[in-house]
């Protein structure tokens, strides 16, 4: 078989100490073969030097729409300040699609550089920010598809029942490609229960 890439002399995570290193053949962006001294030709060969090869990291909870905004918020230095959500809420009306895209791209690039290959990001929708955060992050799915699988969770950070219009924005987010629905139950009163 011909490969696009062969990583030679690599150690798999489940390999026993006495097992020899192995080769990994990649074709069309996918692992096509794993075997010691893999035959066939390759457009590119990389020496693993006996180093560990493992699955990429998964970032399961990040908010790309709000990444890198600390300088815009008047936040305390405590781990989780009581007013953090309110301070973010006060500045998110300034978000533009282009602004979100630029900030989120920088964060994604850092995550890719540290080995992340899958990411689930929560993106706020409400009448204050509309769909700008979602559109800004959505623009990055195809741009970074080569390195990371980006899943978007649409989320009513400031509440659903207490924030008229949020439900329509959530539906629009789901119709627009979001695959997961998040929630912020601490913002909802208990009278309806």
Regions found by a protein language model. Give the residues of each.
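N-terminal metal-binding scaffold of metallo-dependent hydrolase/deaminase domains
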Residues: 1-41
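Divalent metal-coordination and catalytic microenvironments
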Residues: 10, 24, 29, 50, ...
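Hydrophobic alpha-helical hairpins/lids featuring a short glycine-rich hinge
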Residues: 55, 60, 86-127
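Metal-coordinating catalytic core of metallo-dependent amide/deamination hydrolases
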Residues: 91-94, 121-190
């Amino acid at each position: 078989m011909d490969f696009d890439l062969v990583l030679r002399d690599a150690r798999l995570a489940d390999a026993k100490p006495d097992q020899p290193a192995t080769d990994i053949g990649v074709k069309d962006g996918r692992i096509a073969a794993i075997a010691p001294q893999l035959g066939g030709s390759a457009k590119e060969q990389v020496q693993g030097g006996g180093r560990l090869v493992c699955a990429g990291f998964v970032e399961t909870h990040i908010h790309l729409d709000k990444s890198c905004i600390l300088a815009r918020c008047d936040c305390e230095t405590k781990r989780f300040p009581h007013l953090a959500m309110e301070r973010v809420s006060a500045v998110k009306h300034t978000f533009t699609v282009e602004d979100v895209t630029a900030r989120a791209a920088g964060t994604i690039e850092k995550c890719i550089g540290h080995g992340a290959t899958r990411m689930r990001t929560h993106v706020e929708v409400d009448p204050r920010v509309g769909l700008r955060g979602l559109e800004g992050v959505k623009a990055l799915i195809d741009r970074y598809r080569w390195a990371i699988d980006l899943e978007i969770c649409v989320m009513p950070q400031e509440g659903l029942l207490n924030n008229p219009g949020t439900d329509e924005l959530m539906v629009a987010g789901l119709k627009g490609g979001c695959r997961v629905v998040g929630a912020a139950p601490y913002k909802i009163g208990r009278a309806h229960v």
